[in-house]
Each structure stands twice: as C-alpha cells, then as structure tokens.
Amino acid sequence: VNLIWFVWGMVLLVSQGYLPLNPDGNIGQTCHQAFNTCISFMVNCNLQHYSGESGLTYFTQLFVIMLFQFITAATGMAAMAGIMNALSKKTTKTIGNFWDYLVLSSTRILLPLSLVVGCILITQGTPMGFDGKMEVTTLEGVEQTISQGPTAAVVPIKQLGTNGGGYFGVNSSHPLENPTYLSNM
C-alpha cells in the first residue's frame, strides 16, 4: 500500500506546476527532490529540502504532505494498538487487524482532533484559504509579499502526528502558523 502512496506522491510533486490550486505558479519538484520528499514523509522523518510555501502548491500540501502526515501518524498508532492488544493477553496468536486499527485511529482520533484544532487556529488568525500571495505595504512603506494558503488545515495533523515539515519554511516559528499564545499551546 505504501508503494501506491509513494507513486501517488511522486507523480503529484513532479507535476504540481500543472495541477490546480497553484495561484502562485510554483513549478514541479525535480525527481530527486520529489523522491526525498515522499520517502521522508512516508517514514515520518519529514526532512524538507524546500520552503513549504514556495516549494509546494496548495494541492500538493493537501493531497501529498497532509495525507502522508495522516498515514504515518495512524500507522504508528495502529502498530501501538496491536502491541498493546498482544500485551494485554496471556497468550495470543494474533495481535489484531492492522487495517482496522489504522482506519479507527484516522477516523476516530486524528481527523476529529485535527478539525477541532484547525477551527481553533482559524479563530486565532492562522490563514485558511486558496488565494495567492498577498502584496502589502509595511509601516515603513516597503512592499512585502505574504504567503497564505490552507495553513490551518495542514498544521493540526503536523502537531498531532508529531510530524515535522511545516507549511512555512520556518515551521511553527512563522507568525502566521502560530499567531497567538493560544495557538502556540
């Protein structure tokens, strides 16, 4: 199954320049970079050799990175559930159904918590939209480009699944990923 997800991620990352939800015109990753991104997010080490807001499109943030972060967190939870199930019995020949544990941990724990945390982040000012970069004038009168996007959708699973790989290049240090004290908790 992971091979299918890996191929899915590779195809989308390499061709992201032609996919929808790309208002900033980001180009596709090279094969080497897409390979590194897919492998690192599939095994939950989340090594980033790109800046999230400029190296990925909104589409690939949602349908590759966020998907992989759900899968890896649920995989770890399912493995732990199987181990706990086996340890709770005096003798056993099986440790349970991995697929069942995977689906339950995704749909009963990770998804509901991510939705709640995402709603909290939106109320605190974390961006959640599909508009392109904003051009603003600073107090000094200088033009600045501010990245936006579906940040409030990606950050919760990153935090719940103990994944790295932030939406912005500096991860949770970015003021839009962590705008208030409450969102920092």
Please state what every model-predicted region is.
Residues 56-130, 174, 181-185:
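A conserved hydrophobic secondary-structure block that centers on an alpha-helix together
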Residues 2-27, 109-129, 142-144:
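Hydrophobic alpha-helical membrane-insertion segments
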Residues 2, 28, 69-73:
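Short gly/ser-rich anion-binding loops that grip negatively charged ligand groups
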Residues 1-11, 36-45:
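A generic, lipid-embedded transmembrane alpha helix
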Residues 20-61, 128-185:
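P-loop potassium selectivity filter motif centered on the GYG triad
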